[in-house]
């Protein structure tokens, strides 16, 4: 059985091994239900690292039953045709696909629908919200077409797996079978609780700690926005703020961002 997983997002490669920033089971979980002789081919962005330190905090996802193949850099518009050609070639004999929201998956879904190849949409983000407010103009311009094709990919999927219980399901509905796999529950926030919290912050005389939880090496989590805001506060004389980040990934880029705005 020829099973294929497709995503834009990058994994890391060093010394013959492959690494993921979050989980050692990120791809092996898709082997469930396959026979021992079946294999999974993952088409993904791959970053080649030059030293062990760069992947020291990442998870080894090397697996004899998983083959990793390079997808061209999706952020470069010149590669769009190459990605489309690649999808046409690799899906020629595919039996089933896992498509994670993105450009490559959007191309792949068009081919799957044309060739009647069953697939599962892996819906892990609100792709419109993540692109429409991006710092790069080119990414913002891609928000509408990418949103359209992502909505179609999810809507027409045989199956959809969501990382939320309600939010993504309501924004990216699927006509096929779907599953929400989030284990996070949000408490209701009323106006009184919000007012009390804001008053507490305004009366805070000591150090105020700001925190984010999420991958530290992606631009979509908002850490750079906080770093820039803190730099402006510092320039205005407000220095009683500390920013703490919790998450997987290489923190080097965030440190460089801090230095660029003069806060290192």
Language-model features: locations:
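Active-site proximal beta-strand in glycosyltransferases
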Residues: 2-8, 112-131, 176-181
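Acceptor-binding helix/loop patch of EC 2.4 sugar-transfer enzymes
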Residues: 7-17, 68-73, 120-150, 188-189, ...
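Nucleotide-activated donor-binding/catalytic signature segment of Leloir-type glycosyltransferases, i.e.
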Residues: 242, 255-264
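N-terminal subdomain of nucleotide-sugar transferases
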Residues: 1-53, 64, 92
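Conserved donor-binding/catalytic core segment of Leloir-type glycosyltransferases
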Residues: 4, 199-221, 227-230
